[in-house]
Amino acid sequence: MAVGLQSLLRTVVDNKASGLHIRGNSNAYVRLNGLMKPIDDSFLPNDEVKKMAYACMGERERRIFEQYSAVDFSLDAKSFGRFRFNVFRQMGKICMAIRHIPLKIPTFEELRLPGDILRKMSNTRRGLILVTGMTGSGKTSTLAAMIDHINKNRAGHILTIEDPIEFMHTDNRCIVSQLELGVDTPSYTAALRAAMRQDPDVILIGELRDPEVMRAAVGAVETGQLVLGTMHTVNVTQTLSRLVDAFPVEQHDQVRLQLSELIRGIVCQRLLPTVKPGMRPALEVLVSTPQVRKLILENKPSDLQKAMQQGEFYGMNTFDQALAHLYKEGAIDLETAQSAATSPDAIMLAIRGVSGSLDAVNE
């Protein structure tokens, strides 16, 4: 790894930044508390960026990059971190988007996540748990914390399928097998087919990115495993719709029946800038209850939203409830709460205490 790049990566770690952006004939930038900030005296000519990129890539990565003009991979940087790289071209020039992955797997508490409900989900022996959100919302960290909890608290075989491998897990009470796409398996679906012969108790799917993978994931759950995965969806109802739509229309009723029986929890998250410099997650949480299972089966998204609003006892809440809580706590300002809200009016009523809930604007 080029010395100049190591220095830049050290800057990321020392400043607790989440990522680094490098492009030719420009200063490098870090992403700090959600915002892009230039690194002083870091101007890099195009040729130097190209040398950096090629020094990081192995033969396989270079072959993929030269064929597709983009490639993902992860690298260790000696003792100060692990990094996920995306090398790509723009206007014919090589650029790098690099995300920091801590060497230590964070706990739920360190991530400011609701540990009680996530531990309860993680303790499930069979079913489907989904963590969803847009790129950069913290999905990978949340799943890593869940896998780490399982690894420390039950005996079994954890199989992860990732593109690329990010957090590194070591055997504890479980043995952990980590597969990387393009290195250990050609695809998610191929890995899931092979997984049934590898005796896993828990399967982590890095991303349910297309209908074929979604169908394979549901099939894996039906054979008796606990399956965890991520999706790029913004809320619970969109997640359920995306899963159902992965199947032919004539199977939708049957799929809803399957999902009502198989889903153990859905966690949708967003990272928000806080009043004090930093970021906090806001979560929408769905937990499998008899009422939730019935509403999934009957395809009643509006009623499902109300069930989450009224499901605090089970650990459920909507995004707007999470935002109102963060605002009342003083963690985020009103502008942030309103801009991230599903219903800005509902947020205002909740903050002012009108009717004591969000129901008044959702009837």
Regions found by a protein language model. Give the residues of each.
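Short, flexible helix-loop junctions that flank or precede catalytic/ligand sites
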Residues: 1-363
